[in-house]
Amino acid sequence: MEDGVAGPQLGAAAEAAEAAEARARPGVTLRPFAPLSGAAEADEGGGDWSFIDCEMEEVDLQDLPSATIACHLDPRVFVDGLCRAKFESLFRTYDKDITFQYFKSFKRVRINFSNPFSAADARLQLHKTEFLGKEMKLYFAQTLHIGSSHLAPPNPDKQFLISPPASPPVGWKQVEDATPVINYDLLYAISKLGPGEKYELHAATDTTPSVVVHVCESDQEKEEEEEMERMRRPKPKIIQTRRPEYTPIHLS
């Protein structure tokens, strides 16, 4: 029994502490929720909501964005002036200094309010309401915090070459070049090769044959004679194809 009584008491104390902290927070304006309509109460199951403390109904709206995005709209909103006027009149009741941005290809409309409180009121009242036979949905637009109007430079990652930069960063160290891999055995074997000689790479075994490299001989005089003979040879003449005889139809 003691545990059953202590639980609600601790919960009420925690809620009261949170409410006091919210009231003491500087620069924060608190507004209560709009009362639920009869249809909404029926959807929620009905009942008396008087047991809810008014402090629990207060919500911090200071950090909410001042724009909403309307989705699932009828295509007539983007082409028909009368339908567009009806659509805008729904939101002008919450804010007179309101602007609209229509995105026909995305079938969405961005509604810009003068303050976040009007945007929150419109979202609470018009979200999932029927307009022109379709259920309209409202979402808060994402806010962008731009510190500077200039494009920020890219991060200097992986921009340092092996040579030291003009102003090395803290902790930069010179990278040593790797030692090239040289096969001295192969160079020694190639140096011992001569024209007309052969070199045995692998000796034969009982199960494998030997691998022998034969160096091709090069006769410089013979190559020069072949080149001179190729130059003396007459170039073949390309004979063009003869055009077929043409007889006009009116003369045939």
From Swiss-Prot:
Lineage: superkingdom: Eukaryota
Record-given protein name: Calcipressin-1
Lineage per the UniProt record: Eukaryota, Metazoa, Chordata, Craniata, Vertebrata
A single MF term (Gene Ontology): nucleic acid binding
Species this protein is from: Homo sapiens (Human)
Residue numbers carrying Phosphoserine: 163, 167, 218
Leader sequence segment: none
Induction profile: By calcium.
Start-end of Acidic residues biased regions: 219-228
Pfam family, one: Calcipressin
GO biological process: calcineurin-NFAT signaling cascade; calcium-mediated signaling; locomotion involved in locomotory behavior; negative regulation of calcineurin-NFAT signaling cascade; negative regulation of smooth muscle cell differentiation; response to estrogen; response to ischemia; response to mechanical stimulus
Key words, A-Z: Phosphoprotein
PTM characteristics: Phosphorylation increases its ability to inhibit calcineurin and decreases protein half-life.
